[in-house]
Amino acid sequence: MIKRALISVSDKTGIVEFASALASKGIEIISTGGTAKALSAAGLKVINISDITGFPECLDGRVKTLHPKVHAGLLAIRSNEEHMKQIKELGVETIDMVIINLYPFKQTILKGNVELEEAIENIDIGGPTMLRAAAKNYQDVAVIVDPADYKNVLNEMNESGDVSVKTKFRLAYKVFEHTSHYDTLIAKYLRDTLGDIDFPETLSLTYEKAQDMRYGENPHQKAVFYKEVGANTGLLPSAVQLHGKELSFNNINDTNGAIELVKEFDEPTVVAVKHTNPCGVGSADNIYDAYMRAYESDPVSIFGGIIAANREIDAKTAEEINKIFVEIVVAPSFTEDALAVLTQKKNVRLLKLENITDEISPDAYDMKKVAGGLLVQKYNSQLFNQEDLKCVTDVQPTKEQMEDLVFAMKVVKHTKSNAITLAKGKMTIGVGPGQTNRIVPTKVSIEYAGERSQGAVMASDAYFPFSDCVEAAAAAGIKAIIQPGGSIRDQESIDACNKYGIAMVFTGMRHFKH
């Protein structure tokens, strides 16, 4: 039976109503600081925590509840005769319910440009200590950390006169989930502030649920989408959905790939993605021409794909997009006329991502789950170092060819390895992704390109182990190649390029993607 409740909250949503309901059941209310003032102002009888401890709040409120009379009252096991004897001798009364939420550390650090001192002052000490104590003794203490639980707890109390052990256990779980999340945010903030710890000895990560899903990659798999706290605003979790049904697991995965690729480009660019691989990319002076280039790259594969643009979608572009079925269009904005066109189709999802061009931090973690472990690396934010670029052939690429080579390298960087991309006139004309050798994606991309390969350029995500890719490129009429270099047989590929009059540039930077 709940006789005494301790309330100390920073988020006062619904707390007066909840405390009033407790008081109406004859439950004694103990409180601290601002919470006590708010409850008293609402006409509730409140016992100040100082009256319980016999010790005043001090150090600007840093010490309020860190006292044996509080924690013994929380941790005493009611069925343990020795415990109950001890607290009686010590003059301690039990506390049966704790309602606490913590100092707003997350909200403080997310404001931007926060001073370290302010962040530190918003690290709660007494709150987590009481929460953990109450949760540890869940058999005897109901502990509430989430205002969303007020209603259910009251309903149960109204029906049965108490809170069941089953409910207390679930509430205790939420406490440890919450304090773990809270502490992880603090540790990450301090690590980021230090700035010299790339990979800590123990890695704690914390995310917040963004969306439940009907299923995962396949219908028999359960799934959910979590968002990173404080992530760059130019990433998918910050997108606003303007139209269409909720995004699926595969939608999110593919859209993320499209967003990451379109960030590589400064000029107006449209990216089309299927199964996380680009199937059409085009850059131009305006977004309409960029879309047409992306579409014409591969009019077959773009069907049912994801489209990402780094400029506002206008009505003219929307009309072209509407001629085919696409799953998603993500862009920094849409004109009203464009929305009127695109929303004619109920199955297309429209996402507005205002800061889609924002770069991803080079310090961001790129993680891959493996069975029993986690691979963590820094995000692949570089394309190449300008000083490492070198033409290794007799023939030098023209200015236009060099622009296309850089364009193609941006695309192949975001294509599953082993990958080859062909480009001409700032549009892809053939993409060969995800093969177990290098000659097959070369042939695949050439087959996609057809006659368009004449005069085109080629990009490879890794070095050529043999000269066979150059031979195939020459036969297709390709005039320039860009690749990392680094093979023990580089000279064979260089000799083949010289034989056929092909320019070849080494970047010195590999871009495997798995």
Swiss-Prot record:
Top-level taxon of origin: Bacteria
Write down the chemical reaction(s) this protein catalyses: (6R)-10-formyltetrahydrofolate + 5-amino-1-(5-phospho-beta-D-ribosyl)imidazole-4-carboxamide = 5-formamido-1-(5-phospho-D-ribosyl)imidazole-4-carboxamide + (6S)-5,6,7,8-tetrahydrofolate; IMP + H2O = 5-formamido-1-(5-phospho-D-ribosyl)imidazole-4-carboxamide
Write down the CDD domains for this protein, in alphabetical order: IMPCH
The Enzyme Commission number assigned here is 2.1.2.3, 3.5.4.10
InterPro entries membership: AICAR_Tfase_dup_dom_sf (IPR024051), Cytidine_deaminase-like (IPR016193), MGS-like_dom (IPR011607), MGS-like_dom_sf (IPR036914), PurH-like (IPR002695)
Q: Does the keyword field hold Transferase? A: yes
Please quote what the entry notes about the protein's domains: The IMP cyclohydrolase activity resides in the N-terminal region.
- Sorted alphabetically, which NCBIfam families does this protein's record hold? PRK00881.1 (NF002049), purH (TIGR00355)
The molecule here is called Bifunctional purine biosynthesis protein PurH
| Organism (species) | Ruminiclostridium cellulolyticum (strain ATCC 35319 / DSM 5812 / JCM 6584 / H10)
Q: Which gene encodes it?
A: purH
